[in-house]
Amino acid sequence: MSFTNCLWVMAGGALGTLLRYVVSVLALPISGQLPWGTIIINVTGSMLIGFFGTLTLAGGRYPVSDTLRLFVMIGICGGYTTFSSFSLQTLDLMRDGHYLRAGFNVLGSVALCLLAVFIGYAMAATINAKTS
């Protein structure tokens, strides 16, 4: 982990978060009962990390430096959506034949994240109630 690579990841993350904001704002007119901005971000981020990650592998059609892969895949995609990393890691598990692990990754992540959100909500609601 070099300082230069950290700077590239940070720059990509800044770009990714800006893109996330822009897409979220652009999606506001179509958002109704569903958070379409988030859905669009998660789907396009997952597609981008799968496309770029595969195309730029050492054995891919357009191999690039590890630094550029860090910039795009961890920086931009990570700032844009963490769901893309989750999706890629789940696909990697399935491609390696670890279907049970992939299933646990999906179900476990969703269940644990929902539980964590609930716990965070409950803790904050308790604090809010005490200060009212």
What are these regions (language model features)?
Residues M1-S132:
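Membrane-interface helix-loop junctions in multi-pass transporters/channels
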